[in-house]
Amino acid sequence: MAIRPILPYPHAGLSGICAPVTVFDDHLRELVTDLIDTMRAAPGVGITAAHIGVLQRVFVLELTPGTILTYINPEITSHSPQTMRHVEGSVSMPGFTDEVERPSTVEVRFQDITGAEQTETAEGFHAICIQHEIDQLDGIFWLKRLSRLKRDRLVKKWEKSRNP
């Protein structure tokens, strides 16, 4: 329906903790549609409601073109002891990426757009994306998963790119 403005890092809205969704109605469907449109325009493979200034526990992923995955009130219920490293970034900090280490498999409980409870086991890149977006719903920007040295270097480059 609409491409919404994305909050740029380090906007305070990105560190807010998102509230659970309690009403599954047309407003929620409109939010999800706006998230999809905004994510595709960014472009990105995932986006949370927090990225557009809405502090609700909603995110969408598009890992395969044309296949949208919607997660409402997601919660990781278990994860593997095995980890993997993968390059991560954010629509709030376009063009800046680094490797982050996370569990390679997760089980997630969530609700779909109708409010129905779902569970899913995700592996590899899919698992990484779920963890990344749930972190954002909890106010944890992906940079916090880096060492202080890497984080400081990226933030300096980001600030310089915004204020040449």
Swiss-Prot record:
* Residues annotated as transmembrane: none
The record's active-site residues are: 133
Q: What are the recorded Gene Ontology BP terms?
A: co-translational protein modification; translation
Molecular function per GO: peptide deformylase activity
Per its UniProt record, what InterPro entries does this chain match? Answer: Peptide_deformylase, Peptide_deformylase_sf
The record's section on SUPFAM superfamilies has: Peptide deformylase
User: Its domain of life?
Assistant: Bacteria
Q: Name one Pfam family in it.
A: Pep_deformylase
- Family label: Belongs to the polypeptide deformylase family.
Family annotation (NCBIfam families): pept_deformyl, PRK12846.1-5
PANTHER family named in the record: PEPTIDE DEFORMYLASE
Q: What is this protein called?
A: Peptide deformylase-like
